Amino acid sequence: MGNCFRRLSLFGQPTQAKYEMLCSSDDLETEELTFFLDMTYKDFGVYQNDIISHQKDTETMKTLLGLLPMYKKTKLRHTVMERCLSNCPNHVKDALCVELMKAEKILQTMDVVFMKTLIGEFSMCTENLNQLLNKFATDQSTLSDVEKINSLIEIDGENSKRLLVELDPILHEETGLYQALPNVVTEAPSEKVKSIRVESEGESV
């Protein structure tokens, strides 16, 4: 099948018209993938020539092309959340931190998958990757529930402290009332009481 061209210039002589060769969507995706991998992993020693050498391996490129949209979507979410974290209201900050942690974990895992696919005999189908992402979602959901429980415990503790502080004046007032009551005699009888008791016993005899 021949290449397709698009005419750029509609003016002038037909022989002077300019054309550009049209690329298929697959070619554009491959170019985008090559650029992305080169920018992301060249610091680790994976260069563009190494990436291009994989283009002949259909399965490898298919795996990488399947990973790229998910990576870009997660990276975009991570960037937006990171930007919003400093200015978000306090009541949503905890939830945002959990989502940010989830995105970071997914990106780290996909970095490993990209690297292993580039330098090793490793491939992952989209279904398996979705299962992996679902696993992270479950783990982070559990973490979120644990954080909620911890928050409830902290709130309960703060409420208990507040109640104790509010009750403190009342307890002091009741203590003052108790101190105003007559003391209960707990000491040994005095000599006068003893003599009265002896006289009473003598009369009875």
Curated annotation (Swiss-Prot):
Main location as per UniProt: virion
Keyword Lipoprotein: yes
Lipid attachment points (S-palmitoyl cysteine): 4
Organism, scientific name: Human herpesvirus 6A (strain Uganda-1102) (HHV-6 variant A)
Free-text description of this protein's post-translational modifications in UniProt: Phosphorylated. Palmitoylation is necessary for Golgi localization.
Family indicated by similarity: Belongs to the herpesviridae UL51 family.
Subunit structure: Oligomerizes. Interacts with U75; this interaction mediates U75 incorporation to virions.
Residues in the signal sequence: none
Function description: Plays several roles during the time course of infection, including egress of virus particles from the perinuclear space and secondary envelopment of cytoplasmic capsids that bud into specific trans-Golgi network (TGN)-derived membranes.
One Pfam family cited in the UniProt record for this chain: Herpes_U44
GO CC, alphabetical: host cell Golgi apparatus; viral tegument
Keyword Lipoprotein tagged: yes
Protein name (record): Tegument protein UL51 homolog
Keywords linked to the UniProt accession: Host cytoplasm, Host Golgi apparatus, Lipoprotein, Palmitate, Phosphoprotein, Virion, Virion tegument
Compartments where found: Virion tegument; Host cytoplasm; Host Golgi apparatus
